[in-house]
Structures are given as C-alpha cells and as structure tokens.
Amino acid sequence: MSLLKMEYNLYAELKKMTCGQPLSLFNEDGDFVEVEPGSSFKFLIPKGFYASPSVKTSLVFETLTTTDNKITSINPTNAPKLYPLQRKVVSEVVSNMRKMIESKRPLYITLHLACGFGKTITTCYLMATHGRKTVICVPNKMLIHQWKTQVEAVGLEHKISIDGVSSLLKELKTQSPDVLIVVSRHLTNDAFCKYINKHYDLFILDESHTYNLMNNTAVTRFLAYYPPMMCYFLTATPRPANRIYCNSIINIAKLSDLKKTIYAVDSFFEPYSTDNIRHMVKRLDGPSNKYHIYTEKLLSVDEPRNQLILNTLVEEFKSGTINRILVITKLREHMVLFYKRLLDLFGPEVVFIGDAQNRRTPDMVKSIKELNRFIFVSTLFYSGTGLDIPSLDSLFICSAVINNMQIEQLLGRVCRETELLDRTVYVFPNTSIKEIKYMIGNFMQRIISLSVDKLGFKQESYRKHQESDPTSVCTTSSREERVLNRIFNSQNR
C-alpha cells in the first residue's frame, strides 16, 4: 500500500483514466471519497496503477522470489492445448512479466480479449505456467462451472465456495488447496481477504468490467488494502476507470470465420394502448424513469410488438433456420411472459428459463449444452455477461435500453467459435406505443451500429415473416405503408 499526497501530476494521470468520471479513492482515514485537485489529504494509490512503465515512481514492489506459495499438484503434461492466437497471448504475458520483474513493477495485467477468444483456458494455461497458488474470483455462480471444468482439465487441486465464507475459512485451517474458486461477495470478509493475501500469490478477477472500482465495493477495498502479488483482470469490454487498479493491458485482435448477421425486424403497428399503458406513459418524463424503467415496462406490455417477436421466433425455429436460441429481456416479468407462451408452443423439453431466482438454473444451463435444439429465455442481468453456452446460434433482443458495454457482452454470447459458423441476431426497432416510438428506434439503432461497426455483423432487412403470414399482427395493410417502411429503413441504416 502507498499513501501519497495528491500532487498535480499524479492527480492528472489518475483523472485521465476515469474518462470524465469522478475520481474516488480511499484516504488516510479509510474513507472512500472523491479526490479533489490540490487536496491536502493523503490517498491510498492502488498497487496495480504502477504496473505501467509510463507511470514514474521511486516505489519498489515485491517480486515472486519473496513468497513460497507454490502449487503442489501441477503436472506439466496436463497443460491445455492452445490455438496459435492464444499462444501469442501467453507469449506477450510472459514477456511483459519479465520486464515488470526486472523493473520491480507490480505483476498486474488486464487481458482484454474478445468474447469467444477462450479467456478461461488461456488463463488456466498461464496459471499452470506460473505455478503459484491462485484465487479465481467470479461475479456470480453461473461462471463457476466453466472455471471448474478447465481447472480440473489442468489437473489442479481446487476448492469451490459459493455460499458461506465462514465455513470456507474453517476448512482452510486444515487444508490449503492450490486453487480457490469463489464469488466476489466473499471479499466482504476481512479475515478471508487477509488469508488469501498471505497464502495465495495470483488473483484472477473474471469479468472485471462488471465491477465499477470507482465505487466502494468489496473488490475495490480488497485491491486497495490486500493487494495480491500477481493479478489478472479478464474482460472483453474494459471499464476505463478500472485501469487505475490494473494499469497494463494486453489486447490481441481475433480474426473470425463466423458469418454474423443482424436482422432489424420492422413493422408498422396501429397505436396500442390500455389503462396500464396510459398510467405508465405519464411517468416517462418523471424522476421515476431516470434509468428508463418505465420505458422497458411499456415494452413488456406492448402486445403487438411481443406478438411480432414470438411470430418471428416461431417461424425461424420451425423452419430450422436457427436451432439454439437465446431470448433476452430487461425485466423479469417480460421474461416470464415469453417463457410461458413459448412453453405452450414447444413444451419443457425445448423451452428453458434462465431465472436468477431459481437456484437450479446453473445446473439447467449445464444440461442444455448438449441439446441440438432449445430456446433459452433469460434477462440481461442474468445472461448478458458470462453465459457459457458455446453452441448458441441466435439471439433475440427484446429490450432496448442497453449501454454499449452490455451490448458488446450480450452479442458475445453468440460469437463463440464452434464448427457451425452461422450466427444470427434479431432486433425489433418498432413499437405500437407512440410515446416511446422514436426513443426505441434510437436505442435499437445504437445496437445495430455497434454490432456492425465494431463486432463484424452484417445488417440485413428481414422480410420473410411479413410475406409469409398475411394475417399476423406484423403485416402491412397497404402499398403506401410498405413504401413508408422502405423509406424508414433507409433512413435508419
């Protein structure tokens, strides 16, 4: 730990990383506060900030030669086989680590690798290469299984803890496994933080973008007060301000053979309203809609739009065009609505729900990985980051209010490399609720633009459904409407 006065150059360097956000750190009294320029307080500067050689410092940091927390169960023959690009990452990491050790810099690296790159297996290879006792920290239980599978494949002795940290501490008094896989809420326990700081050298923070380290969270406090000897942040979408805690980044671009298509399923709707809708519309401009809660609530009861989504999914699934579908909503009640209707159509052997309130959901996710055809309905919160179903070939985005980081993570769910190359995303830019029509169009255009400009998707118009079912709610009723539809499409590309 280093308590320093906030001199101008130090403040400028830290503030630059926040990209306009307030800069918040722990002060000498242990309070987590916003840092003001010229402050007379001393602040706890995160160890990982000094990982970059561009940061000038006279501080000298410990190296691995000062500890003896070595893995005992390592077997070199169990090292996973890597693709050439993954081996390139390993080579870059090893090279950077050598330079850090020579210059006595903290061994902290962010692995900024695309969704589907294989961050888990690459990191397990690095873990075995370092041969140091490791803590793997995940944001939720759903990510445990993919780490468990890879750690077991490497043959490392490990312990998984997802519930009570107190019972884990009792077990650690008599045994000290080479690898601990834990959920991040364990870091709220100071005794546990002290234990892993003393007995484990490598700390892996999976899905690091899910933590805002400018907030006073358990992870923030751990990295500030109990900084590990070595640390990896893993993410496909780095949060800029988090770089203050891990200021060295390796980013290797990944070329893909996947054929990625995004369809904007357009339709003209007659205005639709109910007493409930009229009540919620009144709240659109109020403080209760600060985070667009009522915007999403209105979408969840937009019956014509919901029916269009169902009609499109049913037709595509029945035709065999898509086979392993992820349906994403923002709100739980919206998820349940789609689940019940799809369950009535296809039955429980095909339709599954990814419900955060159901403790059996992680086991269910494991079971559907081997299915050739399924429909998995879930929320952005539960399945938008880290969902490990590599065989997914299609995504239906039913919500609209999604930030860029969430969009990239969500689209990454269908960008895992498998032998099947076609990937399809469906978005629905129209609504029958006139008060949010333009807002929804703008939000959906952001999803389309990011998918095309950054993630390599190709946008195509979706006409099949409208032409094949003239009686459905999504049909256009006249030639004039069809012409207007084409004009609208051209303006929004």
Curated annotation (Swiss-Prot):
EC top class, as a word: hydrolase
One Gene Ontology cellular component annotation held by this UniProt entry: virion component
Residues engaged in binding ATP: L113, A114, C115, G116, F117, G118, K119, T120
UniProt-listed SUPFAM superfamilies: P-loop containing nucleoside triphosphate hydrolases (SSF52540)
Keywords from the named record: ATP-binding, DNA-binding, Helicase, Hydrolase, Late protein, Nucleotide-binding, Phosphoprotein, Transcription, Transcription regulation, Transcription termination, Virion
Motif (DESH box): 206-209
Cited InterPro entries: Helicase/UvrB_N (IPR006935), Helicase_ATP-bd (IPR014001), Helicase_Restrict-Modif_Enz (IPR050742), P-loop_NTPase (IPR027417)
A Pfam short name: ResIII
One term of GO molecular function: DNA binding
EC number of the protein: 3.6.4.-
Function: DNA helicase which seems to act as a postreplicative transcription termination factor. Involved in ATP-dependent release of nascent RNA. Forms a stable complex with single-stranded DNA, and to a lesser extent RNA.
Family: Belongs to the helicase family. Poxviruses subfamily.
Assembly: Interacts with OPG087. Might be part of a transcription complex composed at least of OPG087, OPG110, and OPG145.
Protein name: Transcript termination protein OPG145
Organism: Vaccinia virus (strain Western Reserve) (VACV)
Native organism taxonomy: Viruses, Varidnaviria, Bamfordvirae, Nucleocytoviricota, Pokkesviricetes
